[in-house]
């Protein structure tokens, strides 16, 4: 789908670039596959802010997505492609031959009326799901499991994909979008193709208000605060902060490594390339 630009009738319209969603379903979502979603405003169960810059925004309903793709050997027909406010990718409503319906993440080049299937061995075409051990080396995949049966976790965002670059001793070798090379069990499921809506990266919201509609509140820089509020705060006039960048709680940020899962370190063959 293409991008939409607008006549500069206001400053916000001048900068606005959106994805053209005119080809998507214009009705309501499948009611049996949705549930209520309450906005947390970045608060946890104690009511304290655990994620800053969240709050407000339009009310949403959660679409229940099938990330596991474990309904094997039953063909499904794509009924429609839909917008999902909870993610950047588009979703597809599929209807199985036995009457069951499900939402899946829509890959690129998937169209209404197409047939998709999850199986031990299936055709290499967008939307089909199978274990990594049965997918040819070099194939582009998305919605990849990290643990067998847990459901896809890798490459679910708009335009993303993972490339299968090798197989060795029961493991599949994957090249991620970050450049990281890692191993995943060959029994893990993956879906063929790249995720839909690759133009998402070119969207420009045009004004701060549109971000607020999405539940994103303003982000205040530490150097603009007072010393009581942030380690970078204070100083007469504009200052550079005077120390290496830290969070409001004094922990190093911007480049500080935060990964601490030694059990899976051996599965990472090459780390992602950082600046």
Curated annotation (Swiss-Prot):
Ribosomal protein is among the record's keywords: yes
Pfam families membership: Ribosomal_L2, Ribosomal_L2_C
Top-rank lineage group of the source organism: Bacteria
GO CC annotation, single: large ribosomal subunit
InterPro entries referenced in this protein's UniProt entry, alphabetically: NA-bd_OB-fold, Rib_uL2_dom2, Ribosomal_uL2, Ribosomal_uL2_bac/org-type, Ribosomal_uL2_C, Ribosomal_uL2_CS, Ribosomal_uL2_dom3, Ribosomal_uL2_RNA-bd_dom
Gene Ontology MF term list: rRNA binding; structural constituent of ribosome; transferase activity
Alphabetized Gene3D superfamilies for the sequence: 2.30.30.30, Nucleic acid-binding proteins, Ribosomal protein L2, domain 3
Region (Disordered): 225-275
GO biological process: cytoplasmic translation
Task of the protein: One of the primary rRNA binding proteins. Required for association of the 30S and 50S subunits to form the 70S ribosome, for tRNA binding and peptide bond formation. It has been suggested to have peptidyltransferase activity; this is somewhat controversial. Makes several contacts with the 16S rRNA in the 70S ribosome.
Subunit structure: Part of the 50S ribosomal subunit. Forms a bridge to the 30S subunit in the 70S ribosome.
PANTHER family linked to this entry: LARGE RIBOSOMAL SUBUNIT PROTEIN UL2M, RIBOSOMAL PROTEIN L2
Family: Belongs to the universal ribosomal protein uL2 family.
Protein name: Large ribosomal subunit protein uL2
Lineage: Bacteria, Pseudomonadati, Pseudomonadota, Alphaproteobacteria, Rhodospirillales
Gene: rplB
């Amino acid at each position: 789908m293409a991008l939409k630009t607008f006549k500069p009738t206001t400053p916000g319209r001048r900068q606005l670039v959106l994805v053209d969603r005119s080809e998507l379903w214009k009705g309501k979502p499948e009611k049996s596959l949705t549930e209520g979603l309450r906005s947390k405003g970045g608060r946890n169960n104690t009511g304290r802010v655990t994620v800053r810059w969240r709050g407000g925004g339009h009310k949403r309903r959660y679409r229940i997505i099938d990330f596991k793709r474990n309904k094997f050997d039953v063909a499904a027909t794509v009924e429609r492609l839909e917008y999902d406010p909870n993610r950047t990718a588009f979703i597809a409503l599929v209807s199985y031959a036995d009457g069951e319906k499900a939402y899946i993440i829509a890959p690129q080049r998937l169209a209404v009326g197409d047939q998709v299937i999850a199986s031990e061995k299936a055709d290499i075409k967008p939307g089909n799901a199978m274990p990594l051990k049965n997918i040819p080396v070099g194939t582009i995949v998305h919605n990849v499991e990290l643990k067998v049966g847990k459901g896809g976790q890798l490459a679910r965002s708009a335009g993303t994909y993972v490339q299968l670059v090798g197989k060795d001793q029961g493991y599949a070798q994957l090249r991620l979008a970050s450049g990281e090379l890692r191993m995943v069990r060959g029994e893990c499921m993956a879906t063929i193709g790249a995720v839909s809506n690759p133009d998402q990266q070119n969207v420009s919201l045009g004004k701060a208000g549109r971000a607020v509609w999405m539940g994103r509140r303003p982000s205040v820089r530490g150097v603009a605060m007072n010393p009581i509020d942030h380690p970078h705060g204070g100083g007469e006039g504009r200052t550079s902060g005077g120390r290496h960048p830290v969070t409001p709680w004094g922990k190093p940020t911007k480049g500080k490594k935060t990964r601490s899962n030694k059990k899976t370190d051996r599965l990472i063959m090459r780390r992602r390339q950082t600046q």
